């Protein structure tokens, strides 16, 4: 672990704050007149998922935790765990859904046999990185009604992982679409 000045903290940094690992969700830097600078942080506790707001002076220091990014292949979901394979050792390991922040939200984006980046702190997985856009096959789509195109009309489509998103009327069953993994919104149709 190393200490860094609060002015050097970036969004997405991993910090040890009050003895617990946190990720920086938001960061705002303010330069005061003669009083120096302050940094406002929004932190998410990686253990209990609580979100706190902290204000630090620009000269304050905090502990930055050393994390390791490991590429692992997603194999399958087993009750409350996700099973991955380490690509270097070929060992299989499980990650409990309740142990990782926002993992429940990311499960519907995981596809078997795909490789994902897991963020580890020591031997513990603390985060999972998704690509910005993920390709899915549409398995169910509402029927588009002719004449619904006065505005930017959208309909619900169900993807092969169970995720339901709004998509344009021209999307049909069997189409492949890209979905933004951060906003869970339709991005574009995959060209064949």
Curated annotation (Swiss-Prot):
CDD domains: S1_EF-P_repeat_1, S1_EF-P_repeat_2. It comes from the Bacteria. Pathway: Protein biosynthesis; polypeptide chain elongation. InterPro entries: Elong-fact-P_C, NA-bd_OB-fold, Rib_uL2_dom2, Transl_elong_fac_P/YeiP, Transl_elong_KOW-like, Transl_elong_P/YeiP_cen, Transl_elongation_fac_P, Translation_prot_SH3-like_sf. It is found in: Cytoplasm. Disulfide bonds: none annotated. One of its GO terms (molecular function) is translation elongation factor activity. GO terms for cellular component: cytoplasm. Belongs to the elongation factor P family. Involved in peptide bond synthesis. Stimulates efficient translation and peptide-bond synthesis on native or reconstituted 70S ribosomes in vitro. Probably functions indirectly by altering the affinity of the ribosome for aminoacyl-tRNA, thus increasing their reactivity as acceptors for peptidyl transferase. This is Elongation factor P. It comes from Borrelia duttonii (strain Ly). The gene is efp.
């Amino acid at each position: 672990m190393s200490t860094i000045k609060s002015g050097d903290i970036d969004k997405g940094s991993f910090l040890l704050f009050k003895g617990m690992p946190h990720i920086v969700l938001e960061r705002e830097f303010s330069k005061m007149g003669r009083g120096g600078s302050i940094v406002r942080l929004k932190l998410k506790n990686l253990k209990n998922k609580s979100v706190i707001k902290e204000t630090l002076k620009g000269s304050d220091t905090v502990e930055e935790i050393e994390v390791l990014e490991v590429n692992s292949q997603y194999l399958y979901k087993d009750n409350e765990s996700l099973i991955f394979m380490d690509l270097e050792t070929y060992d299989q390991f499980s990650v409990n859904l309740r142990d990782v922040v926002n993992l429940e939200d990311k499960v519907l984006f995981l596809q078997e046999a795909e490789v994902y980046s897991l963020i580890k702190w020591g031997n513990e997985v603390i985060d999972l990185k998704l690509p910005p856009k993920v390709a899915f096959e549409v398995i169910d789509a509402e029927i588009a009604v002719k004449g619904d195109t006065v505005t930017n009309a959208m309909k619900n489509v169900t993807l092969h992982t169970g995720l339901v998103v709004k998509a344009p009327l021209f999307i049909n069953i069997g189409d492949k679409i890209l979905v933004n993994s951060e906003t869970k919104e339709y991005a574009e149709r995959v060209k064949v």
